[in-house]
Amino acid sequence: MKIFRQNIICWSICCLFFASCAYQAEPLFKEKRTLYYYNIENIAVLPFIDYTNTQGVSREVTEIFTEELARFNESGVVHATAMLNYLHTNKIVITEHNIREVGLQIGRVFNVDAVVIGAVTEYDPYFPPKLGLSIEVLTVSDSETIFTTSETYDASFNFVREEIKRFAGTKKVKDSVYGDELIMQKMDLYIEFVSYDIIRKNL
């Protein structure tokens, strides 16, 4: 019985290890990633500002980006719903002018080390899709910007399609279709891809 129990434990550990490894398209040294380098143990993602004025996009991008960040990093991530509920309860409206101030305020309320401030800069769901995201990571203790980027993923370019294929390879499950064409046809999957790629390479 003791040997059986040890085997079960070892098998469970192996499954968790391979599951985490399988999600990455290629190995990256975590020492080079921002959250590890700055010893960020917990983080919150503010609702993305939507410069495209597309209904529902801010919430969708915020939720998907938060889920990808939680899936990919060892850091604890405040769920997007908790963040949205706090803002709604306290009647706080985020704008491009107050987002840093609100971010630091929320960071202290939720007792996190850093906050992600994001914006949707481009959004075109029609084939080939296009999505632009601006991301800034701000430490709560000293208001320092430890990472910033602004990128546009235009699926009409071959190099973007190669990254989509790489991402699709990490998501394939037996007897299910999750190919690169489907990712370019469904905008929620495309948002997931863009979030994944930015987080994988930087955070």
Please provide the spans of the model-predicted regions.
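Bacterial N-terminal signal peptides
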Residues: 10-19
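N-terminal segment of the mature soluble domain
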Residues: 52-115, 197-198, 202
